[in-house]
C-alpha cells in the first residue's frame, strides 16, 4: 500500500492499493456528500460499475448515486459532451454538496474534473483511475477539454479531494492501453529516475504486465508529486512534465487511432533527436517496435508544425522541454531544426 499526500493549494491523499475505493470513508467531502455523481465511459461502466457501486453502498449505504456515461475516447472531451453533463447534473438534482467521481482513464479524469470545476462554480470530486496512463493525469489538478484546433485548449487547475487507485483495474486493459500508460511511466523515469527508466526501456509487453504495479505506479506519481508541489500552476518547472509531448500531442491530434501514450513515445524519439542523444533515440526506437506500436499515417511536416504552434507552452516561438548538460529546460527551437528532427524521426522509425 502506498499513501502519498500531495501538498498543493488544497492538499489531498493518493492511495495506491487493492480495494482503494474503501478509503472514500476517510475523505471529508465524501462524508458530507448528498449524492455521488459517477462520470465514466461505457467500456469502464460495463467492466467495473456494478462492483464500484456495491463498494460505495457498503461504505455509504444511504448516499444516493447517479451514473453518467460517455463514449470512450478523446472525442468525448468536447464542449457538446460537457454541456450534456452539466444539463444532466441539473436534471438529476446535483447540488454544491454533490461529489463527482471520475471513474476511468485520463479522458474521464479531464472531462469529469472540468465538470466539477465549473458546475455550480465548483463541486468536490475524486479521481478513481482505471488505466495505467491515468497514474499521470489523475494527480496534479489539470482538467479540461479539447477544441477542434488542438488538445486541452479549454481547462482549469482544479485539485481532486483524493485519488483512489486500485491496480486490479489494470488487468482488464487492452495491449494498446498498457503501451499508452507505459510511455508516460517511462517519461517520468527519464525526467527524474534514470535507473528506473533504464529498467523500463528494456522491457517487452508481457514483462510490463508482470511488473509490481503498485510500486511502479507509485514511483511515477512521486516524480510528478515532487514537481507539482513546487509549481502547481505550471509557471515554471511543471512544464517539464510535458517532455515528449509537444510533438507527441501534434501526432496524437492528427491521428484517429493512436493512443496518447503511444504518441508520447514518438514524441520522445523526436525530442531525443533534438537533444542529439543518439543512445536514447536508438533505445526508444527499439522499444516502440518491440511493444508493437502501429505507427499512424504520417502527415506532412507542415501539419505537425501548425499543431505545435498551438501548444499552450508556446507564444511567439515553439518551445520544447529538452535535457542538456545542466538538466531540463524549455528551449525555443527554430523551424529548420524542427524539420531536421522530423526527417530523422521518420527515418529512425521507418515511418511510411
From Swiss-Prot:
Compartmental location: Cytoplasm
Keyword Amino-acid biosynthesis included in the entry's annotation: yes
Catalytic activity: 7-phospho-2-dehydro-3-deoxy-D-arabino-heptonate = 3-dehydroquinate + phosphate
Cofactor section: Co(2+); Zn(2+); NAD(+)
Any single GO BP term: amino acid biosynthetic process
InterPro entries noted in UniProt: Dehydroquinate_synthase (IPR050071), DHQ_synth_AroB (IPR016037), DHQ_synth_fam (IPR030963), DHQS/DOIS_N (IPR030960), DHQS_C (IPR056179)
The UniProt record lists the keyword Transmembrane: no
MF (Gene Ontology): 3-dehydroquinate synthase activity; metal ion binding; nucleotide binding
Known EC number: 4.2.3.4
Primary site of residence: cytoplasm
Pathway stated in the Swiss-Prot or TrEMBL entry: Metabolic intermediate biosynthesis; chorismate biosynthesis; chorismate from D-erythrose 4-phosphate and phosphoenolpyruvate: step 2/7
GO CC annotation, single: cytoplasm
Keywords linked to the UniProt accession: Amino-acid biosynthesis, Aromatic amino acid biosynthesis, Cobalt, Cytoplasm, Lyase, Metal-binding, NAD, Nucleotide-binding, Zinc
Annotated positions binding NAD(+): 130-131, 142, 151, 169-172
Binding site for Zn(2+): 184, 245, 260
Cofactor note: Binds 1 divalent metal cation per subunit. Can use either Co(2+) or Zn(2+).
Enzyme class at the top of the EC tree: lyase
S-S bonds: none
Top-level taxon: Bacteria
NCBIfam families, per the entry: aroB (TIGR01357)
Family statement: Belongs to the sugar phosphate cyclases superfamily. Dehydroquinate synthase family.
PANTHER family with a match to the protein in the record: 3-DEHYDROQUINATE SYNTHASE, 3-DEHYDROQUINATE SYNTHASE, CHLOROPLASTIC
UniProt function note: Catalyzes the conversion of 3-deoxy-D-arabino-heptulosonate 7-phosphate (DAHP) to dehydroquinate (DHQ).
Protein name as it appears in the record: 3-dehydroquinate synthase
Protein source organism: Exiguobacterium sibiricum (strain DSM 17290 / CCUG 55495 / CIP 109462 / JCM 13490 / 255-15)
